[in-house]
Amino acid sequence: MTALHPGDLLDHYRIEKLVARSGMASIWRATDTLNDRTVAIKVPHPEMEADPNLFERFKREREIGEKLDHPGVMKVYKDDHRSRVYMVMEWVDGVLLRTLMAQGKFSPERAARITARVCEALDYIHSNGVVHRDMKPENIMVDPEDRIKLIDFGIAGNEGSRRLTFANLSNVMGTPDYISPEQVKGKRGDGRSDIYAMGVMLYEMLTGKVPFTGNNPFLIMNDRLLNSPKPPREIDPSISPALQEIIYRALERDPKNRYASAREFAKDLEHQDQVGVADRPEMHDWTARKSHWPKRILNYVLLALVPVVIFTLLLWVARKT
């Protein structure tokens, strides 16, 4: 397939402007000539269209998007008459949450408002049996009134979908800064994994930092298995004890101790005066975290070796074939 350019006609969509580009696809603003509606069109790069994994991802994202109908979820329009693989979505006048976060920390009121709205959208998709599995600031759009849209359901799955294995690591795992501890351990994850990711984003909006760090993705993921995040109020004392408690509940390492639903998360954000603050001794002194250093170092070494092992296996397979 040839590349698109402004002015081209893709079936009955007139291409107007390139608005975003990733390693796999480009997103164009276009006009549907049948009804004069402005839309966004997601088109895989020509060299990627023959990739069966990409085709499956596009198919999954399109099918999930077509069945969801909520103000907080970007709508995917159904259109069975297409000459090539692409996806037609509603046009949203807004920016990525990541773009807003790059401008600086949010006020507690704004961070809570945006997070609550995202949680309302998450509650809707979870009630329809869908888990996003890649919640991050790049997958949330925000308009000038702070209304949100969830986007990119490319690695989303229905409840009961396959668990994480090394064979599907890159397709199912999510993003290291926002992945939940249970997903790091190779478990399937559920709606509470999306809640965890939203807790990370709330922490980041308020403090300007992610709660867990490392020099590579494996160390970032390992950090959340071994350590507790620095208390947000130590970074910014203007954060209320109740809001800090809400973050802690969303970031519980064990999903059973997290919010049971995104609706509960949103409710606490909307009624912070009713949130009880628990005594959390492990959070009192960030510099004196109780960790077993030999075990931690061993974990670091093992995780640092994982990329080497994977590369070696891939090289061995390539030589054999």
Functional labels for PLM-detected ranges:
Residues 82-96, 100:
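Conserved short submotifs of the Hanks-type protein kinase catalytic core
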Residues 78-79:
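A short, aromatic-enriched beta-strand patch in the conserved N-lobe beta-sheet
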Residues 120-130:
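Protein kinase catalytic-loop region centered on the HRD/HxD motif
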Residues 45-67:
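AlphaC helix of the eukaryotic protein kinase fold
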Residues 175-277:
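C-terminal lobe helix-coil module of Hanks-type protein kinase domains
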Residues 16-22, 27:
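Protein kinase glycine-rich loop
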Residues 145-188:
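Activation segment of protein kinases
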Residues 114-115:
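Activation segment signature within eukaryotic-like protein kinase domains
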